[in-house]
Structure formats: structure tokens, C-alpha cells
Amino acid sequence: MTASSGGYQGWERRNNNIPETVGILFLQVRAVSSGKKAAQCRETAPTAGLSESSRPRLFAMDYSKGSKKRKAITKDVDEDPSVVSGDEYDLEALDRNDSDSSADASDSEIELIGDFSSDDGEDDDGEDDDELDSDEVPSDTEPFARVKSGNIATGLDGSLDGESNDLSDDNEPNYRIEKDANGNDRYIYPEINPDDNSEYSEVDEEANTIGDIPLSFYDQYPHIGYNINGKKILRPAKGQALDALLDSIEIPKGWTGLTDPSTGKPLQLSQEELELLRKVQMNEITQDGYDPYQPTIEYFTSKQEIMPLSAAPEPKRRFIPSKHEAKRVMKIVKAIREGRILPYKPPEEEDATQEGIQTYDLWADESPRPDHPMNIPAPKLPPPGYEESYHPPPEYLPDKKEKEEWENQDEEDREREYLPTDYSTLRKVPGYERFVKEKFERCLDLYLAPRVRRSKLNIDPESLLPKLPSPEELKPFPTTCATLFRGHRGRVRSLAIDPTGVWLASGGDDGTVRVWELLTGRQLWSVKLSDEDAVNVVRWRPGKEAVVLAASVGDSIYLAVPDVVNLELEAASLEVIDAGWGYATSTGTSTTKKTSPVQWTRPASSLADSGVYAVIPLGYIAKSISWHRRGDYFVTVCPGTSTPASVAIAIHTLSKHLTQYPFRRRLKGGGSPQVAHFHPSKPILFVANQRSIRAYDLSRQTLVKILRPGARWISSFDIHPTSSSTSGGDNLIVGSYDRRLLWHDVDLSDRPYKTLRYHQKAIRAVKYHPHYPLFADTSDDGSLQIFHGSVTGDLLSNANIVPLKVLKGHKVTGDLGVLDLDWHPREAWCVSAGADGTCRLWM
């Protein structure tokens, strides 16, 4: 009803001089049209048993002589008790008749011509003087006929009250039967509110039915719209200033201070609406019974499964054709053979001659021609930028000063031919005034400007990358964990493989030094050196003629001969250590000036029984031990901040039990010393502090070179073990706590040749393999990384570095991962010590 009423209001504004009675009649006719479409949706209706000639046609209103009573067009219909409607439909507004309107039927005639809602579009001019029932809606197949007021029957004896029946009892029918003016039965149904989902809701007769038409269109009228019966809704009277003040003082419940735009009256809120607003204001849930904390159902787990859920073999039905599908295909084939299914249906050709349209092929007589050999395609326009947007970013918009400067410039001097402009929406963008000129200039450029073909360099990006060999070609290198060594309590700080490659020595936080069989992981020997201090470093003496193990525990260095060798080798090892005691006795009685600042002592009887034969008390904690290649010297470094610079680096002579401090002053720049190593073939000592590495010639007692890796804090370094006079010792690898692995070519520069950043945490140790072109590093992220690093004697070629493998197995404990590693002297094996208290052999 809203749409029909709204349409009439626009019609009323265009025809202000049309009488109001005609407007109301127009509304009633539109109501019949909309009611007919609603009747189509009903499954059963009271008119189902009537003949086609006795179905209702139309009703009309007689407004002659000031009468505004509706008359019903009816026809005598026999009562059919079998026709009962189970649906509810509102025809009360269409069937309401006044009983006293029959007397005025002959005074005036109202003729309605046209079909408002029929589908056939034909006028039934031949049928006249047919009486229509006043309570039914015409069917879809019957158009409205011309109805004259002379044939309109009188109305009802009594008017309807317009109230809905009480349908609380399910057994009662949803209609009531009354007698019309001709004595026939009329089925009266309760009205249905079209704005409500329920069919039993009451109709608000005072509701405004103007729809979406603004109320401003009614400013010049005394009314603000029409109700469902077509009557005007008068504009409510507005209170004065005093009434508004009293209303603001005495605020009723549900008062909002707003005006309802559809009625013009104050807008009142119901209790449910107030409760809804309160919940929204308090940030509560508006829906009753809604639980925001329902338990979540995890459809997927957070654990990534590596193995399949089911390893069952594939069933046989996966590999054989389906019999069911074969039957369906044969059905289709049979239908195609019988002609019931056409595999291809040719499209129907349109006969253009019948429609009077002549068509022809524009390119029928032309064949494609190849482009000219010197043809150059037209250059494409550059893509638009942000400044050409209708809503560009603020930084692209010019200010007043920039706009004035742009306007004062000549067109040739302007950087661009337009100014960026901001519009809120795309529909507000006007036409571009320079559109035609820009297209004209583009056409001039296309056919007047000469084109030049420029050759571009087609370079494959992969060709710029260095060609590295495949890791499969660089085998052997360690890939898997072969042996696990368990026994230490706490972290394993250091380990070392003896020169024969049979035994593995390790030291940890529990103050013990343990010797293992490398291949089996069986513990062969152990000694408890301290109950409080940890074993920081363990290193084997190079050479196979004697077996001597040096260990740093606390502020002392212990020299031991493990009870794992035969008697001859054990006697030779004891002779190497005991040779120094005789030298110390002879020098004590002589007048020589060479005296050791540190006195070597014999251990306690308990340690001597365990295999410890000498103790060197340094006074400070040594974190690094490195042997000379001949096995008679080893250097120790005490990197503590409290250690004096003069005693931080010490060189010890095993055959003389002599300790010397070569550096009397702290190294310039770079902080305290960290690690020291002897050159594998030359009398050069490399000393690394926090930021630099210095090379000293021990024979000449001079500084040879200073390397600057660029790291913040050097943790370890190693020298390439090749004995070639051209390449031996010329390359170093440096590990730092800032996660960088650096390769130094000493002859090339004092800066690193390569910097590798593959670890996520600090690098603890780096090590070259004695014979294979391999090196590795360990990190606190719990991984070892194996690299291939080949060095040649050709000065024109650089080192070739290839990443090979990442080994993971140690657990990160206390933010510490893998603390130390060592290589097997002959095989491509390595061992690692972790903070998780284990050692691992990688093969």
C-alpha cells in the first residue's frame, strides 16, 4: 500500500485542481490491483468453486450528491460448502460496504475503463450488466470490465467494525460468513498488516503511507500524508515555548526530544527500545541467551605431524575402472545412438532478410598483411600515478602558494599540465578540460615523432650469480649424528679428539674431565679436578709419540696422562712431563737469569693416582689453550677484565716447565685479548682481542699484520691448516658474538673476504678440518653449519666457499646452544659439545 499511496502523492502534486474524491477512488483501484496479486499467492480461496462468469470484477465508489459511501458490485452465487479457505487474507478494506448506499445507485454513474493488474492486456467490452461479488479479488486471467454505476448493487445493511477475529482457538475458522445485499454469503477475513511478519497482526489505520517521499513535499499542505483508508493525516499542532519548557521539565518515560518524521508527533520509545539502548551504551550483549565465551572447537592441532596418519597401501579400487560410471556412460551412449540426446545442437541461424537488416563481412576481401620489417610499435603511455587520482594523498595536493606559482608559469615551463585536485567521491569529478588537446597531441606524437629502436641488454639474472658446485659433488662431509656421549652434569664446555682419532676428551661444569671411545661412546677414564670450578678448556698435545692432555680448571692448568694407552706410550708420556722437573732443578742451582714467574707444581696424591702429573697455577681463569705444532709449547689466554695486561697471555714450555709473558702492555685498541693460536708452519703468533687480530713474529719480536674483521666481539678464530708455503696460514675464519662468520685472506686485505650471516644467535666456535677442505661453526641457536672452503696456491684465484649442511640435534639450554667442536684428524667427522650436557659425533 505504501508504493501505491506514494505514487498518488506525486500525481496529486502535479494535479492540484483534481477533486479529492477522484484521488481516493484512484487509491481504492490501486488497492484492488495490489490485492489481486496477493490473492495469487493463496493456495485455496473461497472463489475456487465459482464459475468464471460469477467471479468478482470490480468495486466502485459513488460520490454523487456528496455521498462518500462505497457500493459493492455483486452477483448471486450459490453457497458451496466445500470451498473453505485455510489462509488468512485481508479484504476488509476492499469489501467494506454501507447499507444505505443502494438508494443512491441510480443518481450518478461512474465508469472505470482499463485493466490495472491483468496479464492479458485485453478489454472485455462485450460483457456488460454482469453483477460481481463484492468480497473477492479478480483472478489473473480476467481483466477488469467496464462497470457502470447503474449496475452496482446496494451496500450492506450494516457496516463492518474492521476489527480482527480472535484466532486463539485453532479449531475456529479464520473467517466469518455474513450476508451481502443480495442475500449471498460473504467471507470476511481479518486484516493483515503488510509491514509485519505475522499475518495476524492488527493494522495501524493511523499509520502514514507516503513511503519514502520526504515530508518537505507537504510543507504547503495542512496535512502530512494519508492513512491506509486514504484519509488525510492532519499536521499536529505545535506547542508554544512555554509548553516546550514544561515538557523539558516533566520528562515522561521514553521521551527523546525528537520528532517522528512520519507523523510529526514527539517520538516515544518503548520499554524494549530503552532496554536495547541501555545495553548498547553499557557495551553489553543485546541478544538474550547469547554466550560470547563458548568453548572453542579446535579443528586443527598446533602440532605438525611428519608421518602420515595412515600408511595403509592404496586399495585396488583406485586403479581399476569404475563399473558404476561405466553403466552411466553406456546409458548416455545408448541415448545418443537412439537420438534421444543430441551431442551437438547447431545454433539457430537468424534470417536477417526477414528482419530487413543487411549484414556483410567487413574483412571478407582482405587478407592479413605482415608488419613492415622496420615497423616499430608505438610507445605506451606511462601508467597513472598518485597525483592523477581523484582522491590523492595530502602530500600530493598543492597549497595556495604552489597553485599561484603554477598558474603564473607559462604552459611550456610547467612541470605538469594539471594540478592534483581532491574530490570526496568519484561522481563529483567534472569533465577534464584538456582531454581533447591531450588526445590530439598524442596523435601528433604517434605519426610525426620519429621512433628509434634501442637495443636492451637481455641478461639472465642467474648468470650474475657465482656458479657453485652441487653439495653432492663435494662429499664427504658430516650429515647425521652417529654417537651420543652422555655422562656430564651440566654444560659441556669443551672437547677435543686426540691425534690418533681414537679417544675424545671432554670437560664440563661438573669439574670433571672424561675420556671416551670415539666410535662407541663408552667412557674410558675420568678425573674430578674441582668441586666448585668448571673445566673451561681441554686440549690434546699434538704428536703420536706421547699422550698428554691439558685442561684449564679455575685458575690452574692441569697436565694429565689418561690411563687408556699401553704401558710403553704411557711411559713415554710421563717422560715428556717429567723432563721439565729436572730442568727446573738444574736452573735453580745455576746463575742463569731465566726464571719462570709461575712455579709448576706436582698435584696431590689423589690426583696423581688418577693420572694428573703437573699443575700450573696462573692465578687467573684461562679460557683458551692452543698447542704449537711440535707439541713443546702451548699458549693460554685469560680474557677476564680483572686480569692484568702483562699476564693475560702466557706461553708455556713443556720440556722446561717454563712460563713466559711475551706482552708487557695491553694490546692497543680492541679491548682485552680473547683467543691466541700459533701459525701452523711459521713462528707467528696470532692474538685476537675483541675487535681485531694481530700477527706477531716470535723470532723477530715484531708486529707483522693487523686484521680488522669488523665484528663487535670476536669469540673464536682458526687458521687454515695447509702446510703450503704459498697458501699455508694465509686464510683465517673468525666467529663473533654478533652472529657473523668471516673469512679473511691475509694476503688480500686486512678486511674480511666473505661475511656469512646464517645463524640467528651468537657464534661460539669455528674450526678448520686438518686435511679436507671443510670448516664448521657452532652457535647458540643449537645448530652446526658445515661449509666447503677450498684454497689454492694461485694468487689470482680466491677461495671458494659453499654452504653444505646444517646439523641440528642439541637442545638450547639457558640461551646457550653448541659451545665447542672439533674435527677428526683423518675422517670427515666432527664432534660437538652442547649446553644440554651431551656430546655428539657427526658422520
Swiss-Prot record:
Keyword line: Nucleus, Repeat, Ribosome biogenesis, rRNA processing, WD repeat
GO cellular component: nucleoplasm; PeBoW complex; preribosome, large subunit precursor
InterPro entries in alphabetical order: BOP1/Erb1, BOP1_N_dom, WD40/YVTN_repeat-like_dom_sf, WD40_repeat_CS, WD40_repeat_dom_sf, WD40_rpt
Stretches for region Disordered: 36-189, 364-419
Biased composition (Basic and acidic residues): 173-183, 397-406
An annotated Gene Ontology molecular function: ribonucleoprotein complex binding
Primary residence: nucleus
A matching Pfam family: BOP1NT
Residue windows of the WD repeats: 487-526, 530-570, 668-706, 709-754, 758-797, 813-843
Compositional bias annotation for Pro residues: 379-396
UniProt biased composition (Acidic residues): 77-92, 106-139, 163-172
A biological process term (GO) from this entry: maturation of 5.8S rRNA from tricistronic rRNA transcript (SSU-rRNA, 5.8S rRNA, LSU-rRNA)
Compartments (UniProt record): Nucleus, Nucleolus; Nucleus, Nucleoplasm
Family indicated by similarity: Belongs to the WD repeat BOP1/ERB1 family.
Cited function: Component of the NOP7 complex, which is required for maturation of the 25S and 5.8S ribosomal RNAs and formation of the 60S ribosome.
Binding partners and assembly: Component of the NOP7 complex, composed of ERB1, NOP7 and YTM1. The complex is held together by ERB1, which interacts with NOP7 via its N-terminal domain and with YTM1 via a high-affinity interaction between the seven-bladed beta-propeller domains of the 2 proteins. The NOP7 complex associates with the 66S pre-ribosome.
Name recorded for this polypeptide: Ribosome biogenesis protein ERB1
Organism the protein comes from: Coccidioides immitis (strain RS)
